[in-house]
Amino acid sequence: MSSVDQIVKTFANLPEGERNAAVNAILAMMPPGPGPVRQIPEPVPQAPAPKKKVNGFMGFRSYYSSLFSQFPQKARSPFMTILWQHDPFHNEWDFMCSVYSSIRNYLEQLNAQREKKITLQYWLHFAVPVMGVLGRENYLPTLGWDLVTMPNGTIDLMRIAMPLFRKNLQPMDGLCLFTKCQEGGLQVDNQHFVIAKLSDPSHDMIWFNKRPHYQQRHAAQTDSSEAGVSALFPRNHAVAAEADGVATVQLPHWMQQGDFGTESGYSPQFETLLGSILENGNATSNDSYNMALAMDVPMMG
C-alpha cells in the first residue's frame, strides 16, 4: 500500500475533532499563497503610423521593373534609373502616386476582406491606361530603348532611336482619375468614403495637361527675335521693315507675367512700333490678330 493510501486511511479513521485539528496543523505548515493576481491591461490599439508618401519614381519602378525580370536586382536598378531620367511622363507618375497616397488607407481598410488587395501595382494597372502612359509591352520600343550585348559579353540598356509621339489628354483631378479607374474595372467597397476624400478641396491634387499656348508654340519654332517681331505685322505694312532693326525683344519676355513695360528686356522701340499700329487708321484685317498675339490676350469677336 502506498504512503498516500496510508495517510488517507489514517485520516478516515480519526475522530472528527482530531481530523479537523490535523487539517488545520497541515495548513499552518504550508507557505502563504500568492496575493491577488494583478490584472494586466490589454494594450490599447493605436492608430497605424502614417505611411511614407509614394513618389513618382516608386510607382514607375514598381510598374516597369518586370521588364527586366530576367536580371538580378543589382542589374535592374541601374536600368530603372536610366529609364526614369529620360522618361517623358514624370508629371503623370507624380500625379497617379499622389492620388494613391492620399486614399491608400481608405483602400486598405475598405477592402480588407477582399482576396485581391489594392496595392500600388494593382492601382497602377488601372491608372496607367487612363493617364495615357505607355504600357509595359510598348514602353521600350516606343521610346527607342533596347538591350544590347556589349563586346565583353555584358548586356547594357541603350537608346538606339529617338521617336516622336504625342500626349493628348484632358485636364484631370484626383476624383476624375479614381472614377475612370472604376469604369475600367477597379472595385472598391464603400467607395463613397474615397469619393468624399477626393472631393475635399484641401486634399485635391489637380493635374493639368493643356495644349501649349499658340505664342509658346511660335517661340519654340524660332530662335530669331527679328522674325518674331516681323510676324506681328502684315506683309505689306509700312512699319514692317523697321522690325529688322529691333534685336532686343526676346519672345519669352512677352510670355512672362508682370507689369507691361517694367521688366528687364523691355524695348521702347517695340512700344513705338505698337503705338504706330494703334494710331494707323489703315489697319488690315490681320492687325487685330497680330495685336492679340503680341499682347497675349484672347481674340474678341
From Swiss-Prot:
Its main location: nucleus. GO terms for biological process: positive regulation of mating-type specific transcription, DNA-templated. One of its GO terms (molecular function) is DNA binding, bending. It is found in: Nucleus. Keywords: DNA-binding, Nucleus, Transcription, Transcription regulation. Disulfide bonds: none annotated. GO terms for cellular component: nucleus. Belongs to the MATALPHA1 family. Mating type proteins are sequence specific DNA-binding proteins that act as master switches in fungal differentiation by controlling gene expression in a cell type-specific fashion. Transcriptional activator that induces the transcription of alpha-specific genes. This is Mating type protein mtA-1. It comes from Sordaria fimicola. The gene is MTA1.
